Amino acid sequence: MRGPVGTEEELPRLFAEEMENEDEMSEEEDGGLEAFDDFFPVEPVSLPKKKKPKKLKENKCKGKRKKKEGSNDELSENEEDLEEKSESEGSDYSPNKKKKKKLKDKKEKKAKRKKKDEDEDDNDDGCLKEPKSSGQLMAEWGLDDVDYLFSEEDYHTLTNYKAFSQFLRPLIAKKNPKIPMSKMMTVLGAKWREFSANNPFKGSSAAAAAAAVAAAVETVTISPPLAVSPPQVPQPVPIRKAKTKEGKGPGVRKKIKGSKDGKKKGKGKKTAGLKFRFGGISNKRKKGSSSEEDEREESDFDSASIHSASVRSECSAALGKKSKRRRKKKRIDDGDGYETDHQDYCEVCQQGGEIILCDTCPRAYHLVCLDPELEKAPEGKWSCPHCEKEGIQWEPKDDDDEEEEGGCEEEEDDHMEFCRVCKDGGELLCCDACPSSYHLHCLNPPLPEIPNGEWLCPRCTCPPLKGKVQRILHWRWTEPPAPFMVGLPGPDVEPSLPPPKPLEGIPEREFFVKWAGLSYWHCSWVKELQLELYHTVMYRNYQRKNDMDEPPPFDYGSGDEDGKSEKRKNKDPLYAKMEERFYRYGIKPEWMMIHRILNHSFDKKGDVHYLIKWKDLPYDQCTWEIDDIDIPYYDNLKQAYWGHRELMLGEDTRLPKRLLKKGKKLRDDKQEKPPDTPIVDPTVKFDKQPWYIDSTGGTLHPYQLEGLNWLRFSWAQGTDTILADEMGLGKTVQTIVFLYSLYKEGHSKGPYLVSAPLSTIINWEREFEMWAPDFYVVTYTGDKESRSVIRENEFSFEDNAIRSGKKVFRMKKEVQIKFHVLLTSYELITIDQAILGSIEWACLVVDEAHRLKNNQSKFFRVLNSYKIDYKLLLTGTPLQNNLEELFHLLNFLTPERFNNLEGFLEEFADISKEDQIKKLHDLLGPHMLRRLKADVFKNMPAKTELIVRVELSQMQKKYYKFILTRNFEALNSKGGGNQVSLLNIMMDLKKCCNHPYLFPVAAVEAPVLPNGSYDGSSLVKSSGKLMLLQKMLKKLRDEGHRVLIFSQMTKMLDLLEDFLEYEGYKYERIDGGITGGLRQEAIDRFNAPGAQQFCFLLSTRAGGLGINLATADTVIIYDSDWNPHNDIQAFSRAHRIGQNKKVMIYRFVTRASVEERITQVAKRKMMLTHLVVRPGLGSKSGSMTKQELDDILKFGTEELFKDDVEGMMSQGQRPVTPIPDVQSSKGGNLAASAKKKHGSTPPGDNKDVEDSSVIHYDDAAISKLLDRNQDATDDTELQNMNEYLSSFKVAQYVVREEDGVEEVEREIIKQEENVDPDYWEKLLRHHYEQQQEDLARNLGKGKRIRKQVNYNDASQEDQEWQDELSDNQSEYSIGSEDEDEDFEERPEGQSGRRQSRRQLKSDRDKPLPPLLARVGGNIEVLGFNARQRKAFLNAIMRWGMPPQDAFNSHWLVRDLRGKSEKEFRAYVSLFMRHLCEPGADGAETFADGVPREGLSRQHVLTRIGVMSLVRKKVQEFEHVNGKYSTPDLIPEGPEGKKSGEVISSDPNTPVPASPAHLLPAPLGLPDKMEAQLGYMDEKDPGAQKPRQPLEVQALPAALDRVESEDKHESPASKERAREERPEETEKAPPSPEQLPREEVLPEKEKILDKLELSLIHSRGDSSELRPDDTKAEEKEPIETQQNGDKEEDDEGKKEDKKGKFKFMFNIADGGFTELHTLWQNEERAAVSSGKIYDIWHRRHDYWLLAGIVTHGYARWQDIQNDPRYMILNEPFKSEVHKGNYLEMKNKFLARRFKLLEQALVIEEQLRRAAYLNMTQDPNHPAMALNARLAEVECLAESHQHLSKESLAGNKPANAVLHKVLNQLEELLSDMKADVTRLPSMLSRIPPVAARLQMSERSILSRLTNRAGDPTIQQGAFGSSQMYSNNFGPNFRGPGPGGIVNYNQMPLGPYVTDI
């Protein structure tokens, strides 16, 4: 609360001043409200002068309430005010509502009221009238008083106003139901005053408190007149002191207790409760609502409590505790209060709720929306962040707060109750412009006394910042201000007292900031207060992230260390000055150096400004600088800028001389202009480097000069080229010099486009700077803002050449390009295609051009669309994988010449190697130049690679065993586990080989130093590799070598950092997280002359391209990469141009571990990559197959798990493996030389120890290992040739010493391996069980069960299979593999009975061809070349699986007839195994490495399944229907008889000769089951009566029965049958005989169309039959088959009667297709018209299927041409004359077959459902439908008599019949709707794996890996036993033929020419 400003004598003067300023004040307030209309002004404004009159007004005593009490005017005004209040409050300060007018009106009313009461105020005697008693008030208002005698107990219980009010209010309201709230409050106040005065227990203090409450209540409601001091003579106004107030807090209590002045005491205690609002659910409240009255009531009580607190000191503590609750209530005072002025929603989130109101503006906030957020509301007055920052712009009107109970006292102010600095209370100095308050001693410097006049706080006097701060760089403490001497003591002060202490200031923080839009040259220091005020968020974030007690240490952005910096400062005073001002605060010197000037502009005064790009900063940080700023080399760069403009624009555009400053004459050395016409013939060869290269100071190597000559010649010839020099031979330099030569010799002025990987662009920039100094090179990279700046300023000199903005637009045509070379990344070529594609490029250079190897990539396609005159591609690996990629490179270069990929591959497919190389050279000669280091540097130091085998440490062995044991289940799963889990295990084992600390468990247990790094000695001892590395590095350091250490794992690099710190070596590091600039800096530091760094740590893949570390001569590959190419690229960092020492490469490999095996496999992979030039085979050489993974994991495990004694014995006998792994830079194998030098053991092997296989490295062994003379140069030229050939990735044959021709011609790539399936079982079972016991024991009962990580969880794997296939897993894939696998195991006599014994013997003796081999440049799989593999696949897709006697049928096509039966069957087995192998079709190889060649499992399995079903169905009726479709074609005599008995004995027919034996039902149903399913007995063709159906009928079966009834059934029943069809269309098609001949077929096509649609809808997916749709209950097929038999019976009888030719055919589809309806209509038409053959019906469908069995899938023309199936041509005879006759016929056949295919699949699924005894719950909707069908039938039968009566003319019966028919129609339509939903609700057949309770992998393994199983006959349709007895006696496997995976087949026809 403010201190007193004036005494009572001054009040009249103040009133007079107030009246004089009345008009001015209202204007000001209105102005303030205008600003308030938008909540706050845009710019911060502080108007202390304007506040002054307001403050005077606040200090005056108001007299507006001095009307006579009880007068009507008074009451009406009060009510009016209340109405106004609720209206304004109801709007809640919605943003859409304007308050200005209302608030103005209110203020005008108040002003009028004040004027009206002015005279009374002046004449008042200043005495407060005695308040009226409650009785007087009630009598005056005409209310009934409440007479209640208070007892002693009441005085004890009603201790506060709230309790008293709650007790008495109901009594008053009961007697006066309509009492207004204002009067109720007044009466309650009076009653409380009287009650307190009469209280015998509390005495005078209670009375005083009661008086205060009553006074407060009256103030709120009736406003009793305030006392004003009597008028006195005006006196001269003294000089006003600045405002002060007593704050709250710990510092104020002592003062209050010691104060004698009661008034002051009260003021000190007075607290303004912080205002809260609750933003309502809606933004408007109803006027005078009851809830509003309740809130007003409660807030009035609280107000009363607040006012009473100022008097009652005893209650202050209690009230303080309640303040938080009180603050959350609304306070609605007399008629106007702050609620009307504050918004009803949070300023930040615009939402309502519990909000806190600002006391100095109309804003409101949630506690959590403040920054920083508050946990609870602060005490006292509170200003929002906006007010604290901008100052007060507005003050709320609180009229009632101005009136105090004791008379005229000053109004409560808005200033803070605590000091802003120390947050304590006490006597505070208040600012005149904002709510801030301060202690005098907290100011800096402190003030000795309260200043006179107006005082503004430091925040209000804080100077604004000169701009927007971009970032804070540093902070420091400032010097404190000088001490302030307090004046000399006065004469009345005792002289003995010491002189007063001078007031000392405190140091403040200041911050070094970078300004937005200004360069680092303009960085400056700003005060903390400035930052806090103008950048609050930035300041708070900086505070949160940094230590604000100690300034940060100096950060030398250049990376220089303190020592170097000191030396340089001593030598260079300019550097010293810059260091002191900038560099030490984290600013790099490069950031203050100009890279180039981009543009210029003139200001209004005509002064020039330049846009400057700074070095090492992106383009979006370019800044405009004035002309005369003092920056090094500024003048030179200005000269270069104007010179470049003149050069490019061809005119003198230099800066006018008047703008040049005196004494600053620019150098006038013009840039040399290139010649307009060529001055040198490009075809002329340079013998020495040209003059423009000499001027750069660089010297080209001879081979680089040769490359330049070749490029220039190619350019002259117009031949686009590939420069394919080996890595490290300077392709970049040759390219730059080539472009520079075109420019300097006048051939081309550009522009040139260079596209390179982002990581190498910095290197390109440097090389351009070095080798082409006259080129203007623009690097087009960076974010959108940077690229926008480049486009606007670097692409052209014209301002409007390109539209500005972040969006990319085309450049205007014929605009002068500003640059010579544009350097950009691959990605921006495609992203900013609009601008880059609009420029005509003179030359394109693509670095690392293997990015173009795929012509489908976006980069390839976009770049192809650019306008380019000449193309140059750079690549170190032109044939990285295969010829296809090379072709794409050539196709990109010259699409006119290379445009036929197939022809190109075919041309190089079948020629021998020598011819291939020669032809490749002839072809590539003009286009490609490739040199190797071995070619061009005969004297270049060689590189020698040594594989260093290392032992596992004890800790590593422990973890290695643990990993294998823990993953026992994944390893032991049959089939070898899945690939992902094996890879995970291998990665864990690789980690273990590197270091056990890579596992979190070991890392946690490891000893750690105080600084967080690992203890060095433990770190080294834990890893065998580190122990060796420690010894090696010590010697290498002593000998002066420098080392690169590569590792794949960045965490391993972290451990190596700790190791190097422990050893005390200095090092650098690069991994994937260290990007361009930082990476280059690290390289430069390492390569700097005299650099102290000894080691460079690199991650193998991040340390790849564009890194030159030739200063190192030793490379240690700590762990090998999966892909050997990555390791080669890694060590090429050191073995490159500039290397003058021999490079030693040490590859660490852990002995007898996965690492050793990986190294061997990787070498084989590399050889394979060279071998394979066929497309698709070599592209992912880094990936491992499953067999390889399993093999790698097994390597060394047996030895590891042996007991020590056993290990000693076995190791003593085992010969030590010699080193076969040493390689030199010349290529080739140095095994021989290694043996010569090291004997039979590698270096480090200690031969004296009996345990000879354990490697010990002593000093002698280390010295031997590091000996750099171990080199092999015996056959250098041969090795050169080898490396040259291998660079082309051509095959290198392994020539054996034997003379066998076949062995030389066939290179065996991979042989099938016989693996022990129980390897892991034997090795790990015991350890695994032991570990499980230990775990169980350790975890104990009731403890947490640790989850075992099983990488090969069977349930998870099953789920994957189910997702990929469908829910109803078929047995096909499993059984087929089992059958096919037995080709190799079964005795030949069983499978090949027809072969001669000699042939069998030769086949048996002859070994199978290798799994993968290469013959004459072609890959063979089990001896099958590409053509034979294609022929086999075509046969499968045509006829399905080969039959048992495939060798004697035409299934064996011409291409396959040269194969022996053993080879053929082995390939069938392999093929089926591949089909059963899970995995993506997109993979390039199967698990065993055999190429996929685009095979789609889904399509092949689908085709096999469909063909199997068709064949089975034809064989089912073949013995009845015969072999010929028409009787007249059957030959007479014994041939005909024979054909009736044995069908398909034609050797051209692939169907087996014994159909009854080979093709029973698909699930191998026994005879009994077949009989139950309604199959006819083949032995007794006459016995064709159907079996009796079971009792319960399912819906589809019943529908079938209704439809299949005799033709003489009543029309009503026919109609009913039609309506009951589940998927039938509304209108049945007209019968064919009613249509003209031409319309029959189109009508059928329409029907088929509808059928197709209904099929798609019924199964939900057109490409995959869902089992839900087909699994009906078991009774369905029984009924359906019965109907089929009836139809067959009828049909047979008709045929017997008519042509004595029996025919029988049916498909029991259960009513799920429209087939039977179609047949019914067609047969009716055929029989009635007598055209049995001319109208297509059931008979034609059978012969169509028979033709497909004979001729294959979709061979429509062959089928029609076969005389046996002539019936199929009959319906089309009338259409022969039409032009599209063949097409129409084939289309009909295809669509008809599609329908039959659908029906066959559904029949198969229904049969399976019946076989598995699948039943439905009686409550299932399907069963409910059955009951409803019975209801329909009953209703129809019971009203049949109505039909007869209606026909007889009975009108009442007719009416009833109509009702019955309507009822039937409704029932049927409901049923039809239910039927469509039925398929999704039917039972599911569980997958095979679920039924067997085995995983897919287990089933496959059981079928393939057990040699002792019974043999199984081959053939998809043989009567073989599908499962062996291993599955138990009760298991009944499916019969033969039922093994097709029908669920996963898309049901569409595959009408393709196969």
UniProtKB/Swiss-Prot annotation:
Keywords: ATP-binding, Chromatin regulator, Chromosome, Differentiation, Disease variant, DNA-binding, Epilepsy, Hydrolase, Intellectual disability, Metal-binding, Methylation, Neurogenesis, Nucleotide-binding, Nucleus, Phosphoprotein, Repeat, Spermatogenesis, Transcription, Transcription regulation, Tumor suppressor, Zinc, Zinc-finger. It holds the Pfam family Helicase_C. GO terms for molecular function: ATP binding; ATP hydrolysis activity; ATP-dependent chromatin remodeler activity; chromatin binding; DNA binding; helicase activity; histone binding; histone H3K27me3 reader activity. A motif (DEAH box) lies at residues 847-850. Residues 227-237 have a biased composition (Pro residues). Residues 17-37, 72-90, 291-301, 1355-1366, 1376-1385 have a biased composition (Acidic residues). Coiled coil: none annotated. It is linked to Defects in CHD5 may be a cause of the development of cancers from epithelial, neural and hematopoietic origin. CHD5 is one of the missing genes in the del(1p36), a deletion which is extremely common in this type of cancers. A decrease of its expression, results in increased susceptibility of cells to Ras-mediated transformation in vitro and in vivo. Residues 343-653 are annotated as: Histone-binding. Residues 712-896 form the Helicase ATP-binding domain. The modification Phosphoserine is found at residue 1554. The gene is CHD5. Residues 96-115, 251-272, 321-330 have a biased composition (Basic residues). It comes from Homo sapiens (Human). It catalyses: ATP + H2O = ADP + phosphate + H(+). Changing residue 119 to N: In a breast cancer sample; somatic mutation. Residues 561-571, 1600-1627, 1658-1678 have a biased composition (Basic and acidic residues). This is Chromodomain-helicase-DNA-binding protein 5. Residues 1-134, 225-338, 549-571, 1209-1253, 1351-1411, 1524-1564, 1597-1640, 1658-1696 are annotated as: Disordered. Residues 497-554, 592-653 form the Chromo domain. The lineage of its organism: Eukaryota, Metazoa, Chordata, Craniata, Vertebrata.
